[in-house]
Amino acid sequence: MDDQQQPTVEATGSSDDAGRGSGSSRRARVVGLVGAAAVAAAGAAVGATELIRSRTSTPAIPRGSILVNGVVHRVQSTADTPLLYVLRDELVLHGPKFGCGLGQCGACAVLVGDRETRSCVTAWTGLKDEVTTLEGLPARWAKEKSLTGGAAASTLHPVQQAWIDEQVPQCGYCQSGMMIMAVDLLTRNSSPSEAQIRDAFTNTPPSPHLCRCGTYMSIIAAVHRAARAMA
């Protein structure tokens, strides 16, 4: 099953990475995990400029469709299919990951409107707000800052850039959900304290965001960095 194989595919670091790795090689891998894939996927979907343009207004969502990353998609899956499978299997958006299938780990997190949502336990039907995945964060930021043209197509969301600068990921499997949670938090609180960051990641219903590599301190540093960049 593709979802079950993904941790192996993405956990490409050597044993040296257990000590946070060496500078340039580790940074290159982090950029690949966090940034390059997001920009490439967004561009491949509809073309970066068209994606930015589509986000200037919220399209109507016809019955049987969902609005994802600024684009309305007709869905073929049955009504009880979890949103995660629609995103990954139909729309080929692999930012959200299958972790537990119970909404308990956060690897599958996406934004519905401005709020973090566990897509593995959320049916795709009846969603009235836009869904944003990791791939859609650059366009979301471009819309917020009114960026156009080349600047819009090449600019990562500050949260993504902060994850790169702080070299947060180790295996990287959970980090899409972590970044989504960070965007949710910074939308509600533009300058969170360390205690507030910890609370957001550990007390978000239905359960905490889990990182089995233990990157929590780097995540806190990245959220602080992103907050400064977004100020």
Mark where each language-model region is.
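Signature of N-terminal electron-transfer/Fe-S-associated modules in redox systems
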Residues: 2-4, 10, 16-231
